[in-house]
Amino acid sequence: MSYAIIEAGGQQLKVEPGRFYDINYLGVDPDSDYTIDKVLLINHEDDITVGQPYVEGATVEGTIVEHRRGRKIIVYKMRPKKKTRKKRGHRQELSRLMITSIKVNGSVIVDDSAVMTETSEEE
């Protein structure tokens, strides 16, 4: 199982090709390609490469599937004995990113077609 740890949208995520992830809104049109070059770690066939802080020449490519909103978070402020109450809600804007491949120095080390054949062979 190959994976990479990336930094995107102010978060660090463990990503694998063929899976989708919800990250903070990116401002890119849906169905467009997106390349992330802030790769912190790559694990390929038990060969681990750690960057300082990023792995040189490593990129993770994906496709923006859609933009959506997260679950509503309720913020409730109350001052006791003062009859002061505020109830607010917040929904975070998210982008759904489908990871297609992990590349190092321009060569693909793993892509989603390789992951699909692995899962079909196991069945």
Swiss-Prot record:
Example of a GO biological process term: translation
Any matching Pfam family: Ribosomal_L21p
Signal peptide region: none
Single GO MF annotation: rRNA binding
GO CC entries: cytoplasm; ribonucleoprotein complex; ribosome
Keyword Glycosyltransferase: no
Statement: the UniProt record of this protein carries the keyword Lyase: no
SUPFAM superfamilies found in the cross-reference section: L21p-like (SSF141091)
The entry's keywords: Ribonucleoprotein, Ribosomal protein, RNA-binding, rRNA-binding
Family note: Belongs to the bacterial ribosomal protein bL21 family.
Function as written in the Swiss-Prot or TrEMBL entry: This protein binds to 23S rRNA in the presence of protein L20.
PANTHER family, A to Z: 50S RIBOSOMAL PROTEIN L21, LARGE RIBOSOMAL SUBUNIT PROTEIN BL21M
Protein name: Large ribosomal subunit protein bL21
UniProt lineage: Bacteria, Bacillati, Cyanobacteriota, Cyanophyceae, Oscillatoriophycideae
